Amino acid sequence: DGECGGFWWKCGSGKPACCPKYVCSPKWGLCNFPMP
């Protein structure tokens, strides 16, 4: 359906993948900007 997770959306098991500019932060289980 093309849905993706925006900033600070819950991500991980059973959740939509984060939008391309975000990554799923394992620490918080939320979509966040990639950390350097």
Swiss-Prot record:
InterPro entries per record: Huwentoxin-1
Gene Ontology molecular functions: ion channel inhibitor activity; potassium channel regulator activity; toxin activity
Disulfide bridge partners, by residue number: 4-19, 11-24, 18-31
Keyword Disulfide bond: yes
Transmembrane segments: none
Pfam family, one: Toxin_12
Single GO cellular component term: extracellular region
Subcellular location: Secreted
Keyword annotations from UniProtKB, A to Z: Disulfide bond, Ion channel impairing toxin, Knottin, Potassium channel impairing toxin, Secreted, Toxin, Voltage-gated potassium channel impairing toxin
Domain of life: Eukaryota
Tissue specificity as recorded in UniProt: Expressed by the venom gland.
Domains: entry comment: The presence of a 'disulfide through disulfide knot' structurally defines this protein as a knottin.
Other notes: Blockers of Kv2.1/KCNB1 potassium channels may be a useful approach to the design of novel therapeutic agents for the treatment of type 2 diabetes.
Function: Gating modifier of Kv2.1/KCNB1, Kv2.2/KCNB2 and Kv4.3/KCND3 channels.
UniProt record similarity statement: Belongs to the neurotoxin 10 (Hwtx-1) family. 44 (Jztx-4) subfamily.
Listed name of the protein: Kappa-theraphotoxin-Pg1b
Biological source species: Chilobrachys guangxiensis
